[in-house]
């Protein structure tokens, strides 16, 4: 977080694009402000190329005037039904909208829009940190307008609504997901009144499309520490509406003095462990869902206590219906998550026993190109507080990885290194080390790699004799 004076803001905005916007607005006699995320990110020192501009008047007029100043290389898109316009120039995108005030019907998040002032426009913003505005008109260039002390909230690391949070969330329930997302992405706390309003209005999320919710879920998942967001979602009741199956993991049962671990907390640990290793969105989803089958497979055994046999298989079968309901992709991404969930116990079983070639080869066959991601998930799944037991598994996983690498090399040689080698060619044609031997050896290798000849002795020998004849080694 960086505290910026108006003079410092003016210096940061001392770029051609902002001066051209300023000139365009001044020529039309209209107030013009850069607003929202771009301003927020200036204070947070985060890069941003997407610029939102509010005009007190017609945003389309200012956008058109800017296009004229930028010339042919700029592209103008006008959306008259929404009163907005977009100008694209090189790697910069500027969105223009007229200042407006909004009101909502209870059963819709589509607002009733009227022309308004800058104050009206800032009142309708979702959070104080997104309600910041900086004037671009030449006489006030760089002047910050911050009626809700959003800069202080940025400094304190707080997400809060500008006005009554119950009205903010009831009017547009997607803002509840955005609230959790911003808190997670920025590692901020949610202000107390705002947090309580999330719980009170959670049921309003039902009017939001699955696609919009899925988009916010993916943004939370790609945050540095997504578990923070999932605890917010669970504790406010939002997660119960989105993924009730995940909430089931939070239940701990005790019988005969024996309890099982809290599988929700364990899942959050696994998710964080995976996030430390990769930004792969779908591997993160696999981490989130790897134990999703445990509640449905939980059984009590008088000897063993609580068991979750085949929870990986049960969980894998749940994935398609969950993805379909949440409007997540029903394609190779879903199958990837399903595969990792189903296979995530296999390396653990292998590592707990003798690490044999056959067991690892079967694992390689089933996991295919996703073997490294599977191993990352399995290593993340070791969350035992018993450090000796944890180290035992991690050491064995290292052996499994070494065996996988060794088998890949050996199997490659077995599959693609011709079964007739250079030494045999030399003996067959009574040759020493010479270019002809190298040429014949390369011919056989190319034929195998190109799939023209099976890596079997008889077809390779036939090809060898044909090429030897061409080289004059036999008649």
Q: Where do the PLM segments sit?
A:
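Catalytic cores of the polymerase beta-like nucleotidyltransferase superfamily
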Residues: 1-475
């Amino acid at each position: 977080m960086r505290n910026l004076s108006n003079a410092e803001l003016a210096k940061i905005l001392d770029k051609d694009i902002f001066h051209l916007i300023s000139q365009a607005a001044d020529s039309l006699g209209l107030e013009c402000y850069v607003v929202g995320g771009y301003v927020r990110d200036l204070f947070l020192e985060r890069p941003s190329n997407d610029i939102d501009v509010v005009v007190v008047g017609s945003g389309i007029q200012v956008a058109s005037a800017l296009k004229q100043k930028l010339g042919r290389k700029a592209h103008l898109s006008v959306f008259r039904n929404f009163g907005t316009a977009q100008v694209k120039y090189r790697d910069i995108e500027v969105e223009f909208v007229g200042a407006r005030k909004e009101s909502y019907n209870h059963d819709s998040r589509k607002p009733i829009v009227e022309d308004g002032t800058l104050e009206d426009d800032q009142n309708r913003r979702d959070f104080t940190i997104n309600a910041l505005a900086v004037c671009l008109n030449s006489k006030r260039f760089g002047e910050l307008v911050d009626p809700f002390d959003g800069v202080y909230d940025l400094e304190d690391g707080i997400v809060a609504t500008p006005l009554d949070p119950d009205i903010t969330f009831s009017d547009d329930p997607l803002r509840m997901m955005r609230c959790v997302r911003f808190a997670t992405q920025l590692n901020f706390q949610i202000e107390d009144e705002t947090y309580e309003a999330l719980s009170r209005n959670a049921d309003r999320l039902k009017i939001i499309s699955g696609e919009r919710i899925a988009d916010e879920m993916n943004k939370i998942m790609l945050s540095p520490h997504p578990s923070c967001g999932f605890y917010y979602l669970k504790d406010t009741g939002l997660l119960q509406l989105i993924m009730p199956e995940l909430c089931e993991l939070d239940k701990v049962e005790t019988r005969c003095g024996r309890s099982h671990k809290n599988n929700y907390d364990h899942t959050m640990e696994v998710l964080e462990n995976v996030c430390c290793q990769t930004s792969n969105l779908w591997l993160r989803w696999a981490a989130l869902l790897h134990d999703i089958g445990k509640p449905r497979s939980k059984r009590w055994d008088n000897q063993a206590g609580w068991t979750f046999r085949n929870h990986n298989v049960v969980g894998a079968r749940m994935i398609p219906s969950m993805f379909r309901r949440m409007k997540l992709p029903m394609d190779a991404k879903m199958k990837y998550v399903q595969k990792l969930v189903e296979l995530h116990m296999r390396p653990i079983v292998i590592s707990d026993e003798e690490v044999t070639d056959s067991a690892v080869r079967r694992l390689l066959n089933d996991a295919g190109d996703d073997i490294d991601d599977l191993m990352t998930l399995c290593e993340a799944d070791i969350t035992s507080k018993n450090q000796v037991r944890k180290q035992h598994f991690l050491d064995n996983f290292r052996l499994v990885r070494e065996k996988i690498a060794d088998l890949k090399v050996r199997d490659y040689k077995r599959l693609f290194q011709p079964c007739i080698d250079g030494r045999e060619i030399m003996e067959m044609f009574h040759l020493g080390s010479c270019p002809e031997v190298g040429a014949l050896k390369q011919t056989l290798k190319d034929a195998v790699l190109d799939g023209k000849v099976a890596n079997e002795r008889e077809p390779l020998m036939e090809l060898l004799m044909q090429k030897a004849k061409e080289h004059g080694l036999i008649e």
